[in-house]
Amino acid sequence: MCSARKLLRGGAGSAGGECDEDGAAPAGRVEEPEHGASPRRRRPQDEGEQDIEEPQNHSGEPIGDDYKKMGTLFGELNKNLLNMGFTRMYFGERIVEPVVVLFFWLMLWFLGLQALGLVAVLCLVIIYVQQ
């Protein structure tokens, strides 16, 4: 019979404290203790192989944009700008977030039209090269 104490301690020769319906240890898996580790401090063999489950939305609401999940400065500033009434700009397939528009206006103010044009051309070249 497999008791709770045997399950917690990995008891009586069973592999990791697992028991089948009869209370006997399963025959296929043998776990050897790590050198110098007590049975309670052993970690399961497949601990590194466990998949990290992503949070799922069970409320029926659509999952929001990535910036709502991130706690980055870009995401938080973008979320605040959207809440204040700034809108996204749509250029065909591309969506320009309000924080990017604000960044370009600040660059235009500080650096002037030539520097803004240079940065815009560099951004377009980077986008073109990535495609």
UniProtKB/Swiss-Prot annotation:
Residues 1-67 are annotated as: Disordered. Keywords: Membrane, Phosphoprotein, Transmembrane, Transmembrane helix. Its main location: membrane. This is Uncharacterized protein FAM241A. It is a single-pass membrane protein. One of its GO terms (cellular component) is membrane. It is found in: Membrane. The modification Phosphoserine is found at residue 14. The chain crosses the membrane at residues 99-119. The keyword Transmembrane helix applies. The keyword Heme does not apply. Coiled coil: none annotated. Pfam families: DUF4605. PANTHER family: DUF4605 DOMAIN-CONTAINING PROTEIN, FAMILY WITH SEQUENCE SIMILARITY 241 MEMBER A. Belongs to the FAM241 family.
